[in-house]
Design a protein with these regions (language model features):
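Gram-negative (and chloroplast) outer-membrane scaffold detector with strong preference
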Residues: 34-38, 63-145, 201-211
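Predominantly the C-terminal beta-signal and adjacent terminal strand-loop region
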Residues: 37-45, 50-53, 89-95, 162, ...
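A charged, solvent-exposed segment within the mature domains of Sec-exported extracytoplasmic proteins
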Residues: 130-177
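Short N-terminal segments immediately surrounding and downstream of signal-peptide cleavage
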Residues: 23-38
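Membrane-spanning beta-strand positions in outer-membrane beta-barrel proteins
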Residues: 25-27, 79-81, 126-128, 169, ...
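Alpha-helical transmembrane segments
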Residues: 4-8, 160, 201
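Cleavable N-terminal export/targeting peptides
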Residues: 1-25
Length: 211
């Protein structure tokens, strides 16, 4: 629920841009992708126990929403854009089973990326490449459940990123594309424990609607 509230606030802020803007400079998008998310602490727990363990690494898969606005530069072909979104990653789960205790660890992460980019818009029925840079706010939570008791720990971090991609504009209203992103120093630690590590490359399939 908190993630939906955060997304709603962020999209409302971006959509509060002057309403006199040209109609097709606004956009909203969805994406599905895969990125780095190494559950290092869970692996250390797994390596350090003599009991039965089961580690499910699903935290690299993510889905996201975004809102964007593009300024026309010297003409309608060259554009400077800004976009703000929310990416929600899958869970990493570790189960430890002992003769008397059932122990479960779950790691969840979401990110709020803000990106400024340049795009070469070649119109309908053509590819439009773009490159950009920005910052991402990451929040990771590590939850432990033992015999009905629950303990949570979380940490946040802001990191820089680079981004590049291209989209094919099927109509004035819709484009489908591919996007790559590189996060710098996105290892999220607390008290020496690595809650998640999103440093490195990620890629996504994007769908955007312009209006």
């Amino acid at each position: 629920m908190r993630k939906l509230v955060v997304l709603g606030v962020l999209l409302s802020i971006l959509c509060a841009w002057p309403t006199a803007a040209k109609a097709d400079n606004w956009g909203i998008g969805v994406k599905v992708g895969v990125g780095e998310n190494d559950p290092k602490t869970m692996k250390e727990i797994q390596d350090g126990t003599l009991y039965n363990t089961e580690l499910n690494e699903n935290g690299a898969v993510f889905s996201g929403l975004e809102a964007l606005y593009e300024f026309n530069l010297d003409d309608e072909t060259n554009k400077l854009g800004v976009k703000l979104g929310v990416d929600v990653f899958g869970h990493n789960d570790l189960k430890v089973t002992t003769p008397s205790v059932w122990d479960k660890w779950t790691e969840t992460t979401y990110a709020i990326p803000l990106t400024v980019y340049y795009k070469r818009d070649n119109g309908v029925s053509a590819w439009a490449p773009y490159v950009g840079a920005g910052v991402s706010f990451f929040r990771s939570e590590l939850k432990r459940e033992v015999i009905g008791d629950e303990v949570k720990d979380h940490k946040s971090k802001i990191v820089p990123h680079l981004m590049a991609g291209a989209e094919y504009r099927f109509t004035k209203l819709f484009a489908l594309g591919l996007e790559a992103k590189y996060n710098f120093g996105a290892k999220i630690k607390k008290d020496g424990d690595v809650l998640s590590d999103h440093s490195g490359f990620g890629g996504a399939i994007t769908g955007r609607f312009y209006f």
